[in-house]
A protein has these predicted regions:
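Blade-level signature of beta-propeller repeat domains, shared across WD40, Kelch, NHL, RCC1
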Residues: 269-301
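Beta-rich, blade/repeat-based domains predominating
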Residues: 39-53, 82-99, 121-141, 167-185, ...
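Conserved beta-strand positions in repeat-built beta-propeller and related beta-rich domains
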Residues: 40, 51, 56-62, 95-101, ...
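A short helix->beta-strand "capping" segment at the edge of beta-propeller domains
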Residues: 28-40, 71, 211
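A short loop-to-beta-strand structural motif that recurs across blades of beta-propeller domains
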Residues: 65-67, 102, 154-156, 195-197, ...
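Glycine/small-residue-rich hydrophobic helix-like segments
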Residues: 205-269
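Flexible "stalk/tail and boundary" regions
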Residues: 71, 91-93, 108-109, 156-163, ...
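Short loop/turn segments immediately following beta-strands, especially the blade-tip
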Residues: 199-206, 300-301
Length: 301
């Protein structure tokens, strides 16, 4: 009997060890990014998830192209733009694109587009990252087109046709944006500062106030960003080969996802169960990273 009890106890211990090993393997596999799209793009950016069609929109800035990737079928559709395109977002069933010559709106799959607004007059600028706030207002940033325009760019709120407001001035490379679930906070990145800024946000007016530094990124520079349904931040590290994860309420660092490329540009949460992080990247100019410039996906829950 005592041998049976000892054997039974050993089996229980082995079962627990196996369970822990299985869990560790699951966690390790869960956070391994997989390449899901590659065409040698110089700079992929601005992923935007469309839950209705389970499709991902993203832009190839230097190729003047918007892509739509249907995650159910694997089919890709592309839209040509008028010069460099900084971002593409969906609103009321229409596609909004921030192109070199202006911000446009069009019906999905329609070639005709309507100019909404244009915030700069000089060709030394272009649009960069942009997103809709929880009320559907477009916020879009600017940067130098080719030559850096230090402190001369900004983040703009598009208030209507040919109506816009500069909400953050004096930026250099306006980048990541995101809002908390209750719309009380907005986060924003001006990449060269290496800082992620936090603002109080008034959803009714679209006004920001009480700027403070949420965190400073030391490994690479912060690029694109998103806020998930748990109010945590995912921040792309340009030159840092990863996406870091943060608690928006406490500022606590929660972990990171490493990628096989250095120039990580922007993440977005998507998938049928909102359990997948899609990550755009840019080409390695030295040619040492064969997967650079690809689109990656990784399960996060």
């Amino acid at each position: 009997m005592k041998y049976f009890i000892a054997f039974h106890g050993l089996c229980c211990i082995m079962k627990k060890i196996y369970g822990l090993f299985e869990r560790m393997c699951y966690i390790m596999c869960k956070f391994i990014p997989k390449l899901i799209f590659f065409n040698g793009a110089e700079l992929l950016e601005g992923p935007c998830w469309d839950a209705e069609t389970e499709s991902l929109y993203f832009v190839s800035i230097k190729a003047d192209t918007v892509f739509r990737f249907n995650t159910k079928t694997g089919r890709i559709k592309s839209y040509a733009t008028d010069g460099a395109v900084g971002c593409a977002v969906l609103r009321d069933g229409k596609l909004i694109t921030a192109e070199k010559s202006g911000i446009y709106e069009r019906k999905i799959d329609d070639t005709e587009k309507q100019l909404i607004a244009h915030v700069y007059d000089d060709n030394i600028y272009r649009y960069n990252d942009g997103k809709l706030d929880p009320k559907g207002r477009l916020f879009v940033g600017t940067m130098g087109d080719g030559e850096r325009q230090t402190g001369k760019c900004g983040l703009y709120r598009i208030d209507g046709e040919n109506e816009f407001t500069c909400v953050v001035s004096g930026t250099t490379i306006s980048n990541g944006l995101g809002w908390t679930k209750d719309s009380s906070k907005m986060f924003f990145i001006d990449t060269p500062t290496k800082e992620v800024w936090e603002f109080d946000y008034d959803l009714e007016t679209g006004e920001i106030s009480n700027k403070k530094v949420f965190t400073k990124i030391e490994d690479g520079a912060p690029d694109g960003m998103c806020v998930d349904i748990d109010d945590t931040l995912w921040i792309a590290h340009w030159g840092g080969s990863k996406v870091s994860h943060w608690d928006s309420r406490t500022g606590e660092y929660l972990g990171e996802i490493e990628l096989p490329v250095s120039r990580v540009s922007c993440p977005v949460v998507g998938g049928k169960m909102m359990d997948t992080l899609y990550i755009t990247t840019a080409l390695d100019p030295d040619g040492n990273e064969p997967l650079s410039g690809g689109l990656f996906a990784v399960k996060i829950r």
